[in-house]
Amino acid sequence: MIQMQTNLEVADNSGARRVMCIKVLGGAGRRYASVGDVIVVSVKEAIPRGRVKKGDVLRAVVVRVNQNLKRKDGSVIRFDKNAAVIVNKQSEPVGTRIFGPVPRELRAKNHMKIISLAPEVL
């Protein structure tokens, strides 16, 4: 579960290293985001000469959550850290590479470009 003030790692090569959630999109009083949800983030740490800079306010798709993720077949998947991929207004990734595995729940949320760039889909 991702909520406001949650710090996330960035799982792409957009130039950001760490971001903080400042808003969960999708409804007036929505509090939590999970895998595949779009959030508004602020860049807290970035590498030099990257596409994004520290302080930028951007959109991101949550790709990994620390909380257990239950599936229809009864299995559970869990990641070590919370991670997101920076996207533009059309939900296309800003970076050209994705690092680490992503869950197949992203397919149901129509983030096919992220799935195609990911090295492993769990």
Curated annotation (Swiss-Prot):
UniProt-listed PROSITE patterns: RIBOSOMAL_L14
Entries under Pfam families matching the protein: Ribosomal_L14 (PF00238)
InterPro entries the UniProt entry points to: Ribosomal_uL14, Ribosomal_uL14_bac-type, Ribosomal_uL14_CS, Ribosomal_uL14_sf
Biological process annotations from GO: translation
One Gene Ontology cellular component: cytosolic large ribosomal subunit
GO molecular function: large ribosomal subunit rRNA binding; structural constituent of ribosome
SUPFAM superfamilies in the cross-refs: Ribosomal protein L14
Coiled coil feature spans: none
Complex formation: Part of the 50S ribosomal subunit. Forms a cluster with proteins L3 and L19. In the 70S ribosome, L14 and L19 interact and together make contacts with the 16S rRNA in bridges B5 and B8.
Function: Binds to 23S rRNA. Forms part of two intersubunit bridges in the 70S ribosome.
Family: Belongs to the universal ribosomal protein uL14 family.
Name of this protein: Large ribosomal subunit protein uL14
Source species: Caulobacter vibrioides (strain NA1000 / CB15N) (Caulobacter crescentus)
